[in-house]
Amino acid sequence: MALKDAMRELASAKDATTWEGVDTPEGFDITLRWDAKDELLLIPMRTLMRFGLHEKFSIDVDKWSSYMEEVRVYMHDFPYHNLTHVTDVTQTLGTFLATEKAMGLLTDMDRLIMLVSAISHDLDHPGTNNLYQVNKKSELSIKYDNKSVLENHHIDLSQSVMTKLGLFDNLGEADLKEFTDKMRELILSTDMAQHFGLCGTLQEVTKTWKATKEGDSLSEEDKMVLMKSLLHLADISNPFKKWTICKWWSDRVFQEFWEQGDREKAEELPVSMLCDRDTTKQDESSVNFIDFLVCPFLFACTTAFPELVNHCEILAVNRKEWSDMTVKRLKDTMIAEDEQEKLTEAVTMWEGKTTAFNTEFAELKKSIQ
């Protein structure tokens, strides 16, 4: 069946369950569908339908299908930044938006902008990061003055394609401006260079929101921080998917990193962090990614949206898997090299990291009860 026909059939369904677990945070395994491109392209529409957005905004199904075909073309077959990734981010974001606090906070327009941003946020990704673009002095880095190079490209290309297709021509002038402006802000927030700043701002906004009396509303600025945070969280959600999915994605992340590192070596460019296959350890790097980036951000989001606590539970399980793998590798290496003293120090350090994580998680659970 052609994509447009399948999309029409989906959009006309009254009860579009379509895929088992698609509406649940833990129950949907997108890795089983990674090579079923047409099926992947239906998932964003299914997510819009969950909130009735296709009807509320009178989205033209054929135009939407055409946009999905453009997404298919522009999402290249890199190990990680591919069609499966942007579809996964969209489906995951849909589960965040369905939480009780998010449903009460966001408007239908907010949800539409966020979901369209999710499917568009990596359009035409080149399989290398911003630092590579800057060091390479690529056309994109020059065009965007070395600032959020790829994110600006994703925004400009996706909005250009939408305009060409007339995808949102039915929106009024004010709504269209809100759509394009907020979409730009949201996709820019997926730049990992913005991570720590966004995390700090999120923690402050969360304190404000918790202190707000029932019935009072957040400022538009603070609400945008929460919108950015949920999209960014969906973009870095691999570590808190069930272990088999987490490991599947991690393998692809590091494959793409190492392919970039190989290019950097061949082109005599500085090798980016985590991109040297000869020195980067996937297990240790994954624990550090969880501890320094994912954990603080997920915990802050969970303070704002308590239903996300189940993801924290899964994160703890996956962190233990990576930590156990790291300790085993260290033991195998150091015992073979007869470095018992170094091994004892290393194991003690990793046990200390785990204790710190577990303590912080216990405090989080207590605070949201």
Feature annotation, model-predicted:
Residues A2-E39, T47-E55, Y80, T95-D108, ...:
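Divalent metal-dependent phosphate-bond-processing catalytic cores, especially two-metal-ion Mg2+/Mn2+ enzymes
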Residues G52-F78, A98:
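Internal amphipathic alpha-helical repeat/solenoid segments
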Residues D62-K63, H85-D88, K223-L226:
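Helix-boundary capping/turn motifs
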Residues M68, R72, T90, S117-S120, ...:
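Generic structural concept
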Residues H81-L93:
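Hydrophobic alpha-helical transmembrane segments corresponding to the first two to three helices
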